[in-house]
Amino acid sequence: MEDKRNIQIIEWEHLDKKKFYVFGVAMTMMIRVSVYPFTLIRTRLQVQKGKSLYHGTFDAFVKILRADGVAGLYRGFLVNTFTLISGQCYVTTYELTRKFVADYSQSNTVKSLVAGGSASLVAQSITVPIDVVSQHLMMQRKGEKMGRFQVHGNLEGQGVIAFGQTKDIIRQILRADGLRGFYRGYVASLLTYIPNSAVWWPFYHFYAEQLSRLCPQECPHIVFQAISGPLAAATASILTNPMDVIRTRVQVEGKSSIVLTFRQLMAEEGPWGLMKGLSARIISATPSTIVIVVGYESLKKLSLRPELVDSRHW
């Protein structure tokens, strides 16, 4: 890659941390609002047996919208917003790990791969209990029980804000499984998200390098970065979706064994069962990845320490 194609990377020591975290929370919230409906749809598709209720992403979207309205697409959203904490822990761990690995390797791919995997380990330790509660709320549907637990009372008009539902689910999890219930599927989550995060970065650099060779010299870096991100996300989603299906079933259905869940899924639905919810996952990942690739670098530019803003070309 030619020198003028090289992108100056803003590292941890270049940032005004206060601005970085304030802008970061706002950016993350915007992403969550835009992709949450597809996260909910993906969860329901992965848990349902065969095509007993929904026949695909679009069918699920239409049926949920008809049955529960827009609020139904955001069921469990309030609880899910607590993962903003894990999101900030992710970026902090990612940046600090990059800084640490830089003492041993100057390869951007190596730094990103190790940092991505480490960041996912930290983030998932915080996210899994929130995910468990959020997923059970996602599975609530008027008049039907789709998961292990069902909230009591009328779901009519209750979507985004439903404190009573959340407390009800938490109590049922505690009663059935104790505190361990909030970490059900933890290993499966690690086996899903650590590889996903670690794999994304090498593919991102690969696609960016290939596109930089194809694009005209005057093409801005941001263009092939914005294209490379979703391509890398789609690739990582395809590779890790089987584990994501198993993770979701372990957490929602209360299964205790990854191996037994895998065997049951294969027996009931065959290999295609491992690809359930893939299109919804890619759809939800695409906008967030574009924002992460384009927005995250813009976020870091906005968060530069004042004395560094004009000191070099970022």
Swiss-Prot record:
Induction remark: Induction by cold exposure in brown adipose tissues.
A family per Pfam: Mito_carr
Reaction equation(s) it catalyzes: L-valine(in) = L-valine(out); L-leucine(in) = L-leucine(out)
Superkingdom assignment: Eukaryota
GO cellular component, one term: mitochondrion
Record keyword DNA repair present: no
Subcellular location: Mitochondrion membrane
Tissue specificity annotation: Highly expressed in brown adipose tissues compared with other metabolic organs.
Keyword Mitochondrion: yes
Gene Ontology BP annotations: amino acid transport; branched-chain amino acid catabolic process; branched-chain amino acid transport; regulation of cold-induced thermogenesis
Transmembrane segments: 20-42, 71-90, 113-133, 185-201, 222-239, 278-296
Topological type in the membrane: Multi-pass membrane protein
Function: Mitochondrial solute transporter which transports branched-chain amino acid (BCAA; valine, leucine and isoleucine) into mitochondria in brown adipose tissue (BAT). BAT is involved in BCAA catabolism and actively utilizes BCAA in the mitochondria for thermogenesis.
Name of the protein this chain belongs to: Solute carrier family 25 member 44
Native source organism of the sequence: Mus musculus (Mouse)
